[in-house]
């Protein structure tokens, strides 16, 4: 075949050299997607922003790999599925990787090796790691156009560890050692905002407050007129975080672990639900309640919303005429938001973690008030 096949898009030149693609042999690469990622970097500048936040304590006269080139190579390798730094020993000679970083595929010097990349990843201190997170927050804040109200989801994901990695703790729920990375997502766009690698343990109140405080303050420099709402499960409904949010004008809706006091406050509602469920032909029946509650560790009362669901369960014990037992499942939510109990539970809290199905257009601002 001698006819040229036209490409559906133009590839940009590198160092004033025209870039063409063929399969005639020579030094080939299977990482063609890095050229598209290079264009994304040109548009958004994520790697450059990270490189500027990284400390560079090297002797300027002995530098062979610029900070941006090392960060770019590491990010591109991860994006192509090469998570381990040792993969760079092979990828440093890859022609397309070199092109994407800005070096000529044949005559250009190889990229940074595994040992150089490993030293790079161990350079940042905790303060400098926080500076990198702030750089990503700035990237997000300048990229996403905010509305009048924005919801941020905060949650953790368990990641099993195979070996003796630092901070890999035993987790009884998952029955293995690992990490519990903290993730923050922007609900309207589904964009990840922050990811924090941490030990597999329930976060303390001071830890939750610190994260929420720093993320909120950083985003407010870009979203000065936007109302921010934090949403998370009971791990994040800590008194330290709620008090800071209330004092700083930030809204929240968090899960709340049940206890005997809360159950007593909705006991009458639960009895009425059992009565109506017994007379109903439905397999499940729900109702909602809201009330003011103050736990012993709280310095002020707060609004609590309860969702009660009655259903028939085939467990042993007191049974109905059908051989099934009535059971009422109760879930609690603590919030600073106004609105009906049903709306806050179903339309706001229960949409947690489902970014694709959650939208908060302007006309819904009155509901989440």
Language-model features, listed with the residues they occupy:
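Dynamic "connector" segments at or just before major functional cores
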Residues: 1-203, 209-222
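An anionic, glycine-rich sequence signature occurring as long contiguous blocks
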Residues: 5-19, 251-364
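Short, solvent-exposed helix-loop connector elements
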Residues: 54-63, 341-349, 365-369
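Flexible loop/turn segments at secondary-structure boundaries
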Residues: 97-98, 159-161, 191, 202, ...
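Structural preference for beta-strand elements that scaffold enzyme active sites
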Residues: 149-151, 227-229, 251-253
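Acidic/histidine-rich, metal-coordinating catalytic segments
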Residues: 155, 227-237
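Short secondary-structure boundary/capping segments
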Residues: 166-170, 244-250, 267-272
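Acidic, His- and aromatic-enriched active-site or binding-groove loops in soluble protein domains
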Residues: 174-177, 213, 247-262
């Amino acid at each position: 075949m001698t006819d040229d096949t036209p490409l559906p898009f133009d590839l940009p030149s590198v160092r004033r050299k025209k870039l063409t693609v063929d399969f005639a042999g020579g030094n080939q690469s299977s990482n063609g997607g890095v050229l598209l990622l290079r264009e994304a970097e040109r548009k958004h500048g994520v790697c450059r922003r990270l490189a500027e936040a990284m400390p560079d304590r090297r002797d300027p006269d002995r530098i062979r790999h610029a900070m941006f080139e090392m960060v770019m190579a590491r990010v591109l390798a991860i994006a192509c599925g090469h998570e381990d730094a040792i993969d760079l020993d092979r990828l440093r000679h890859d022609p397309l990787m070199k092109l994407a970083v800005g070096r000529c595929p044949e005559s250009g010097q190889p990229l940074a090796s595994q040992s150089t990349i490993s030293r790079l990843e161990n350079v940042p201190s905790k303060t400098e790691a926080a500076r990198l997170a702030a750089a990503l927050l700035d990237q997000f804040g300048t990229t996403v156009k905010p509305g009048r109200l924005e919801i941020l989801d905060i949650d953790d994901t368990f990641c099993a560890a195979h070996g003796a990695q630092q901070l890999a703790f035993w987790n009884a729920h998952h029955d293995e050692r690992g990490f519990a990375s903290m993730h923050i997502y922007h609900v309207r766009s589904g964009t990840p905002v922050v990811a924090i690698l941490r030990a597999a343990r329930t976060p303390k109140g001071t830890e939750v407050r610190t994260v929420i405080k720093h993320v909120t303050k950083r985003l407010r420099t870009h979203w000065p007129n936007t109302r921010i709402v934090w949403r998370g499960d009971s791990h994040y409904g800590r008194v330290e975080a709620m008090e800071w949010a209330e004092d700083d004008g930030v809204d929240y809706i968090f899960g709340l672990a049940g206890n005997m006091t809360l159950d007593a406050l909705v006991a009458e509602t639960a009895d009425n639900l059992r009565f109506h469920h017994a007379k109903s032909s439905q397999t499940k029946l729900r109702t909602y309640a809201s009330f003011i509650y103050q736990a012993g560790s709280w310095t002020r009362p707060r609004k609590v919303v309860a969702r009660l669901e009655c259903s028939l369960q085939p467990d042993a014990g007191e049974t109905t005429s059908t051989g099934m037992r009535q059971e009422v499942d109760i879930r609690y939510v603590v919030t600073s938001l106004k609105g009906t109990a049903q709306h806050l539970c179903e339309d706001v809290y229960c949409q947690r973690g489902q970014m694709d199905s959650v939208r908060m257009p302007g006309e819904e601002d009155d509901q989440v008030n």
